[in-house]
């Protein structure tokens, strides 16, 4: 299926292609995915999911990471659910009862509004140095990611993404790395703000506990991160793509 770039978290800002193609995994691809997915390697997991998208459309290499993170979720969602709905069940942290909700891609998945000004980057002061920020595409990000994939000095994906926001990593790699990793006080606040601006573009989904509401009248809810929903393809397929009696007719 083709997704117009205007419907991505970036709004398609600066893209010279109108859409990207994302395909649901078929049966043999799901089996291969579950066999080959590097379960104990955080960096390997991210690279594996990224390569799955690139197989669908080479233009993914020119997409912003903020869009690619969403597309990783979208590919998994369209694999487990034909109508892009999803059954969520979490335990209420207050009463311990399960909270169940069917979320819809159209009505429940929302992006934080993008401001075109931030897409042009900014000048920042970090660790006593002045940097220009960029909005990294996959091609930009891989220049940074491949360094850490090789040497494994930093393995936290969010930290690597933060480092990738700085322009000229190829010229100032050690300085940028040190200024990000050793940030304190206001510099930490700055880096967290940059993460939210350039990566955390999906709104969380609030699930209201009806049991708590019924018992004391208070409205208690749990915030669920969209990206963390799909963890097991076959389990999620059973729940979100059930069959009825017409699918199997015994002789």
Say what each PLM segment does.
Residues 1-251:
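Long C-terminal interaction/binding lobes of large macromolecular proteins
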């Amino acid at each position: 299926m083709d997704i117009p770039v205007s419907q991505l978290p970036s709004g398609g800002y600066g893209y010279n292609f109108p859409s990207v193609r994302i395909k649901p995994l078929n049966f043999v691809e799901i089996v291969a995915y579950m066999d080959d997915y590097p379960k104990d390697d955080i960096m390997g997991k991210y690279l594996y999911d990224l390569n799955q998208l690139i197989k669908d459309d080479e233009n993914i290499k020119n997409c912003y990471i903020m869009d690619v993170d969403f597309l990783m979720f979208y590919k998994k969602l369209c694999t487990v659910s034909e109508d892009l709905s999803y059954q969520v069940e979490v335990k209420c942290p207050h009463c311990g009862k399960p909270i169940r909700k069917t979320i819809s891609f159209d009505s429940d998945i929302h992006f934080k509004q993008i401001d075109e000004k931030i897409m042009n980057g900014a000048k920042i002061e970090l660790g006593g140095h002045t940097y220009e920020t960029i909005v990294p595409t996959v091609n930009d990000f891989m220049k940074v990611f491949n360094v850490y994939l090789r040497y494994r000095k930093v393995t936290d994906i969010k930290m690597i993404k933060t480092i990738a926001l700085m322009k000229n990593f190829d010229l100032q790699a050690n300085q940028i790395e040190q200024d990000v990793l050793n940030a304190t006080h206001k510099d930490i606040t700055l880096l967290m703000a940059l993460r939210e601006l350039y990566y955390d573009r999906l709104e969380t989904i609030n699930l209201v506990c009806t049991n708590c509401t019924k018992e004391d009248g208070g409205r208690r809810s749990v915030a669920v991160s969209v990206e963390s929903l799909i963890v097991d393809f076959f389990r999620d397929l059973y729940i979100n793509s059930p069959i009825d009696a017409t699918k199997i007719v015994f002789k």
